[in-house]
Amino acid sequence: MKFFARHYLVQITHPLIMTDEMEEIERFAKSTLGGMPEVIKLLGHHNVELAKEQFRENNEMYLGRKYVQKKTLALMAMSVSLSNGQESSAMIHFKLAQNFGAEMLEILDSIKVAKMVVMASTMSVMTAILPVVQKRNVKASDDVEINKILAKIQSESHMESLPEDLVSLASISFGLLDEHLKEKSELLSPFIMSQKDVFLIAFADAVSIRYPECAKVYLSQFFIKGGTEKEMEDALFLTRFITGNRTLTSATGILKW
């Protein structure tokens, strides 16, 4: 039997006979989310236990977190989805963020963060390729000038040491370093979102694309802005959920059969 529900929050319009467990899940979903998530509904048609597990994860790892507000969780989920190129998943969380009162400028802040983190991830190869570049005796700029800029970055960010990939980038291409700093200034300067939330979302994005050095930098900045370990834990739970959930959002076409 095919299903053609196209949105995350959908009304039941097909003649399925639901079990008591699925009816209980639906009632709870409507009271907390405003409707039944499509993927849980589809899973329940095939296997109730899988649907129950998905609903448990949705509640315990995502919208049931206690220390980051639901609006920020939804914006974070959207940003993580965008960082991983998951358009359909991003739309799901965009709509949830709207339901929780997110303004369009907050949506744009979250999109900007995702873009910054994904672009910054290209620096992950800089330390590896630096020896190859050095063999050619190519210098991007005067070492004194580079060191001045790096010292300023370290002072302004209050970091004990600069990321190795950033230092390598400066040696490989002064122009790319300058571009990175321009992007950082623009994309990590929010319209209305708090700077703390910007760094928490950036941390989640970096974790999701598996860029440890980037994640370390943004987590440090998050703590400097007053973030807590509990909020960090919420972000890690959410990132784990959204990362694994990609398999289900990609499988909705299969589950509709």
Label the model's feature ranges:
Residues 93-117:
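Hydrophobic/aromatic-rich structural module bridging two neighboring secondary-structure elements via a short loop
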Residues 68-71, 101-106, 193-194, 226-230:
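Helix N-cap / loop-to-helix initiation motif
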